[in-house]
Amino acid sequence: MKVLALRHSVAQVYADTQTYLHDDSKDEYENAFLISNLTTHNILYLNYSLKTLKILNKSGIAAVEVQSPDELFALIRCNFTYDYEDNIVYLHDYSYYTNNEIRTDQHWITKTDIIDYLLPGWKLTYVGYNGKNTRGHYNFSFICQNAATDDDIIIEYIYSNELDFQNFLLRKIKERMTTSLPIARLSNRVFRDKLFPSIVNIHKKVINVGPRNESMFTFLNFPTIKQFSNGAYIVKHTIKLKQEKWLGKRVSQFDIGQYKNMLNVVTTIYYYYNLYYSKPIIYMLGSAPSYWIYDIKQYSDFTFETWDPLDTPYSTTHHKELFFDKDVNKLKDNSVLYIDIRTDRGNMDWKEWRKIVEQQTVSNLNIAYKYLSTGKAKVCCVKLTAMDLELPITAKLLHHPTTEVRSEFYAILDVWDIITIKRFIPKGVFYAFINNVTTENVFIQPPFKLKTSPTDYIVALYALSNDLNSRQDVINLINKQKQSLITVRINNTFKDEPKVNFKNIYDWTFLPTDFELKDSIITSYDGCLGIFGLSISLSSKPTGNNHLFIINGTDKYDKLDQYANHMGVSRRSHQIRFSESATSYSGYIFRDLSNNNFNLIGTNVENSVSGHVYNALIYYRYNYAFDLKRWIYLHSIGKVAVEGGRYYEHAPIELIYACRSAKEFAILQDDLTVLRYANEIEGYINKVYSITYADDPNYFIGIKFNSIPYEYDVKIPHLTLGVLFISDNMIHDVITVLKKMKTELFKMEISTSYTYMLSDNTYVANASGVLSTYFKLYNMFYRNHITFGQSRMFIPHITLSFSNKQTVRIESTKLRINSIYLRKIKGETVFDMSE
């Protein structure tokens, strides 16, 4: 959902759009809540309040002030991520296809021959990091840039087995135009760029688990973050390979040698970071043209010093000359060295050229060893060729994608590698490595062990759900790690499947009830965005590969109505009730009937079941941004800090009733996941609340009326306002509560309209207008540790006779209270009060 705030209405009508006029009779929170539960995707918010916009944005719902028709058109036509702190809108808008255009935010691609393989009449446009260069297209009151690019298609092509780029591109664009937008992936880079600076500013030691290539630029500014990935392919792993021959396979129609070099250097930088936690100087031999340096510098400031007889235009310092063994002493400590020296074959005889290449490989290794043998804080990435070679068994082998699979590969060496054992590797084994192994990640750090790290802040986004990990170990880590942001795949199946297929692996699935946490927030992607200064126009889909975001050690835990709050909790219910259900009251009716309350008169205003909890359970796939467990816990300990809105404190029994209704709903829907979730939430409610039941009561609270509009044969027809199980020395406490509640009790507007047989030989009249006061009374008794109410639902009624009678219906009649009293069952009245 997106909320576009306008000062004036617009004449044009837009699809899937609704207008909301700010209600001055309600505060900003109540207006925000009402907006969040509207069912259309676009909300035009008139006479808006800035505070209401802020509330929505902090809840993860994109809400933007719009000052002109151009701004409105730009935002209503596409989805976007909004940085509400810095007032930047990141559009995810692919309408540029109508210009016969694809876009990239990687400069090196523009220097290739990719243009020869685009769709006929199409062009490639470089738009800068996250589309920053497009800012000039939008002369708006807020900063606006289009972050949509086709880099995902280009990179997927590079790693695919397909060679025809034009066909691949065409298929992917058609897929993009016919499937829902992968909004989380599109906004994830914006999120990471917002998330990690804020974490690093607060926490000295940060661990990041499972980064992939899409994060390769994000972390260049954070050398102190310790990365964990899937580990490196090292020389000793080649022992498993059988010898092969030269393959010579074409990988890409257009030249991606630049991409390969960039990946090699970035891999080396992150390897250096994990050893030394600082930025290195970057030396490169055989550097020309290295257009990708421009891309690196768009993200982070590095010093590049390069050697090559040809130009390297984006280098900090370039030496237009060859580099020799004797020049190694020019290279300083605290650096990385990338050696990419190889003579081009040209028209040279193959055998002669092969001899030169092997000599250069030995020379490259000698330079690498000499560089690493002196000084400190050094890492080298060196170009090698498939030949009989001795290499350190701990050397890291790289084979990032390049235009053709031929005979080249790379090795990363550190100062410890050069003093470890070397192993002879025959040429055929290196060919087996080149032919069968593609390095898919610039992060080659060791795997993360599922253990807590008390002094570190752990970030693990989309990294731990894989069934290679022990599910219980993942749960234990989340339960015990004091400071972290960890995601796990949500169980949004209908058969309560413990793990689900994802690509070529399986993921464990989780529900919020799998974790035992305090001071932690469990929310969705959009709920998490709101906590870190962002909001989004399209929330996560109810099915598919979605994740719970679990934030441990946050200072926002107590801010219940600001973050991961109840905004939108009824939205799915509204969509169903007002479109396909039997009546818009269907939810109210079902909740009462499923708890054996058959008096449906006024069910939409007088109900015994928490609608919040009920909707949060049965539609959890749609509204898990709302942290239900946190909401329950803070209520249970009486620490609900509320800034505004229409606040109603639920009695714990109302939450139990909601769980019972949700369980019956789940059974009817054959939804085993909701059934378990509702059972576990009910168990959690019973755990955090000390609920006791007066199922064998000894006292009751009665209400006597001036008159009853029915015939009766009991001595005094009365409404039992509740039963208690108390000792005699608690009578004073009960009376104190009744006196505090006196005004509210006598203000009850009780009415009756029919009689019925409650059970065999029990003839009663209905009583409406009681429940809201009953639950307030329940809460007061609960806080005073007085057992009040039974385990079955309280159904207000007035007993008229203990014999079978003919039921009657009358016009709704108000009943005037005469007195309210406390009486021992089968005993005497111990307290009586009148108005």
Curated annotation (Swiss-Prot):
Keywords in UniProt for this one? GTP-binding, Host-virus interaction, Hydrolase, Inhibition of host innate immune response by virus, Methyltransferase, mRNA capping, mRNA processing, Multifunctional enzyme, Nucleotide-binding, Nucleotidyltransferase, RNA-binding, S-adenosyl-L-methionine, Transferase, Viral immunoevasion, Virion
Show the segment(s) annotated as 2'-5'-phosphodiesterase activity. Answer: 693-835
UniProt-annotated stretches for the region GTase/RTPase activity = 556-692
Q: Name one GO biological process term.
A: viral process
Stretches the record annotates as N7-methyltransferase activity: 171-245, 429-555
CDD domains of this UniProt entry? Answer: capping_2-OMTase_Rotavirus
The record's EC number reads 3.1.4.-, 2.7.7.50, 2.1.1.56
Asked whether the UniProt record includes Nucleotide-binding among its keywords, one would answer yes
Give a GO cellular-component term.
viral nucleocapsid
* UniProt superkingdom: Viruses
Q: Where is this region: 2'-O-methyltransferase activity?
A: 246-428
The GO terms describing molecular function are:
GTP binding; hydrolase activity; mRNA 5'-cap (guanine-N7-)-methyltransferase activity; mRNA guanylyltransferase activity; RNA binding
Domain notes, please?
Contains a bipartite N7-methyltransferase domain, a 2'-O-methyltransferase domain and a GTase/RTPase domain. The C-terminus contains a phosphodiesterase domain that degrades the 5'-triphosphorylated, 2'-5' linked adenylate oligomers produced by the host cell in response to IFN stimulation.
HAMAP family documented for this protein: Rota_VP3 (MF_04124), Rota_VP3_A (MF_04128)
The record describes the protein's role as:
Multifunctional enzyme involved in mRNA capping. Catalyzes the formation of the 5' cap structure on the viral plus-strand transcripts. Specifically binds to GTP and displays guanylyltransferase and methyltransferase activities. Has affinity for ssRNA but not for dsRNA. Capping activity is non-specific and caps RNAs that initiate with either a G or an A residue. Together with VP1 polymerase, forms a VP1-VP3 complex positioned near the channels situated at each of the five-fold vertices of the core. Counteracts the host innate immune response thanks to its phosphodiesterase that degrades the 5'-triphosphorylated, 2'-5' linked adenylate oligomers produced by the host cell IFN-inducible 2',5'-oligoadenylate synthetase (OAS). The host RNaseL is therefore not activated.
Indicate the quaternary assembly: Interacts with VP1. Interacts with VP2.
Q: What is this protein called?
A: Protein VP3
Higher taxonomy: Viruses, Riboviria, Orthornavirae, Duplornaviricota, Resentoviricetes
